Amino acid sequence: MAKLTKRMRAIREKIEAGKLYPANEAFALLKEISSVKFAESVDVSVNLGVDPRKSDQVVRGSTVLPNGTGKTVRVAVFTQGANAEAAKAAGADIVGMDDLAAEVKKGNMDFDVVIATPDAMRVVGQLGQILGPRGLMPNPKVGTVTTDVATAVKNAKGGQVRYRTDKAGIIHCSIGKVGFEPDALKENLNALLADLQKAKPSAAKGVYMKKVTVSTTMGPGIAVDQASLSA
């Protein structure tokens, strides 16, 4: 059996297996055990009581985190005319139509989020094989196909995160950086969980939010006591 590194031994001493930690204590622990030199993201995994094999139990959507993600987000918008001007005014990094599609086809994709107006989907639809595998394809269910491009751009820039259940019925999402104050991370987590609750499928039975776990990019998971989140 491989020997535990000094760092892993220290982490095991601080995190009690099987314990549910109050949210603020969990976030403080993440900061304490983080030893890498870059600003790690704080990630959350939420085990949902759904059957993701059934299409009516797939949970997907987006949340605007009140305290942002701590990341700089570059936004591309497929649109034209007055909407193009509105997108630029809202802070979009790249705005275009066929010219932007041509750049995407060349592999020039210096952006993290793609937004499109409905009339632009005839152009964006041709890029599905490029944007889809990268998780960049605009979708009305998460607010990235919209006539209100200004709000969509501001949301993307301001800390909007997207989520979708994986094959095991788990939502994975980043809710900030390890350097955030615990209260700020807690507010972000509460916003996400509130939207997940609203997105609960009517066909889901039993306990819906089964487990909430937080971790850093390179660290172990810490189970959160959900009762501490409303406090």
From Swiss-Prot:
Keywords: Repressor, Ribonucleoprotein, Ribosomal protein, RNA-binding, rRNA-binding, Translation regulation, tRNA-binding. Pfam families: Ribosomal_L1. Disulfide bonds: none annotated. GO terms for cellular component: cytosolic large ribosomal subunit. GO terms for molecular function: rRNA binding; structural constituent of ribosome; tRNA binding. Binds directly to 23S rRNA. The L1 stalk is quite mobile in the ribosome, and is involved in E site tRNA release. Protein L1 is also a translational repressor protein, it controls the translation of the L11 operon by binding to its mRNA. This is Large ribosomal subunit protein uL1. It comes from Thioalkalivibrio sulfidiphilus (strain HL-EbGR7). The gene is rplA.
